[in-house]
């Protein structure tokens, strides 16, 4: 899988590499040992329910988890654990998009540029949004929402999903592969080899 355009990940095939196989094997081991809860398979308790009931020690969640102030009294945000010196998460949230068929491209581009100015980014941060530019992050006052600092630090090493129209299908392929391994229907190598072949076909059509 040639993924994550614009990052170091785009220069190598990595989906079914030995490192990825080892990583998935580790996740499967954690799941079988009960280190990872049933939420990974869409079962109960889910992430929020599990951690609030004391079933889970940690969850991976966005800043919206702390929308209720009392959560900061109970939970502490932290960076994604580092592997080989890299702490990587996926960039999610909202997108600003200008479609290729738009009849107002100039106006759309002007509006996008306006939204990405530091002044607007900082203003939106006051409403709970995390700035999407490094320059705006440096100007945000997080005294009323200290958890935001951790998320902004994590964004420095975050990676975006691949920019392609086939992403929803690719996500389904990946989810199916991971689930088959967690259920014991395939080995990590078998599932990832099959997924890589399917995804390469999809990417070839882009």
Task: List the predicted regions and their residue ranges.
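Paired acidic/hydrophobic, glycine-rich loop segments that form the ligand-binding mouth/hinge
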Residues: 57-62
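Single conserved hydrophobic/aromatic residue that forms the stacking wall/gate
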Residues: 1-6, 10-11
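Glycine-centered hinge/linker elements that transmit conformational signals in sensory
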Residues: 12-40, 71
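Conserved C-terminal helix/tail region of periplasmic/extracytoplasmic solute-binding proteins
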Residues: 32, 153-206
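C-terminal lobe and pocket-closing loops
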Residues: 63-74, 83-176
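Short helix-loop capping/hinge motifs at secondary-structure junctions, enriched
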Residues: 20, 30-33, 101-108, 180
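Conserved hydrophobic residue
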Residues: 36, 56, 186-187
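Short helix-initiation/N-cap motifs at beta->coil->alpha
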Residues: 38-52
